[in-house]
Amino acid sequence: MRVIRPVEHADIAALMQLAGKTGGGLTSLPANEATLAARIERALKTWSGELPKGEQGYVFVLEDSETGEVGGICAIEVAVGLNDPWYNYRVGTLVHASKELNVYNALPTLFLSNDHTGSSELCTLFLDPEWRKEGNGYLLSKSRFMFMAAFRDKFNEKVVAEMRGVIDEHGYSPFWQSLGKRFFSMDFSRADFLCGTGQKAFIAELMPKHPIYTHFLSEEAQAVIGEVHPQTAPARAVLEKEGFRYRHYIDIFDGGPTLECDIDRVRAIRKSRLVEVAEGQPAPGDYPACLVANENYHHFRAALVRADPQTSRLVLTAAQLDALKCRAGDHVRLVRLCAEEKTV
């Protein structure tokens, strides 16, 4: 059974393997053992209540409960930008007009922004290519909503998610090549690595402070503003089905879109509910895939099961109960996947 659980120190080797498969552009999952070890330690200190809000971040892994193999990672930052500034570009408009000359130009413009400061962030979503089947992607992404619903007071009103922008297999980013490289004088992969390993001071020091007309960028760069990496398109679709929207904010490095949603309007959070569990054999039937999660903060587990989403008493097998770290009589959180998400 595939389950979501909190990260552990022993996961470092598995995370290094996952980081080596990202193909670049996933800033928060660098192939750097010291950085990943520090990320794990920060997550564990978050669970133990040792960190201030601005440093808190949860990390989860997707595990095969029978073999112990890890095939994915996802994370939540509790509040971005409270320690280091959290930058993006807002895609807006500047109008230049002259009645005398009968000229009117509305020009798309990039404005440096810290507008999402304090928001909770969904981040570090990566699923091993060999695991991209049987609904694992839905489980990996949406399990975070089950955790947020259970422990709502630990998160802020707005949730954001930066989507990976367009980058080729060689690490070439049209947006970076046309804009960022002119100010940072380094390749995208180098800037991405520095940011991913926590060396972010250079961003504030070198970022252009004035608005930038997108017409000054190459046509190739203009075309990828707000667009996602092909491998990220499914993740974007999953979030959009949950209520997330692109509000014209983009990543300063690759131009990928930032999606956002008020936390209480996220579908899985809004519609999830608590039901009692019982041990037994689930009744036969063509039931939809549902997310099921326990309410145990320190030993959180989430999985996909086929069940009646309207039930008030969820019957699970002994193996399922064990994987979810719960027992008969406990209450678990239940919500079905979106109706069109049937590939489980």
Curated annotation (Swiss-Prot):
List of residues binding succinyl-CoA: L125
Induction (free text): By nitrogen and carbon starvation, and arginine, via the ArgR and Crp transcriptional regulators.
Pathway: Amino-acid degradation; L-arginine degradation via AST pathway; L-glutamate and succinate from L-arginine: step 1/5
Name of the featured protein: Arginine N-succinyltransferase
Active-site residue list: H229 (proton donor)
Enzyme class: transferase
PANTHER family: ARGININE N-SUCCINYLTRANSFERASE, N-SUCCINYLARGININE DIHYDROLASE
Organism of provenance: Salmonella typhimurium (strain LT2 / SGSC1412 / ATCC 700720)
Family: Belongs to the arginine N-succinyltransferase family.
Gene that encodes it: astA
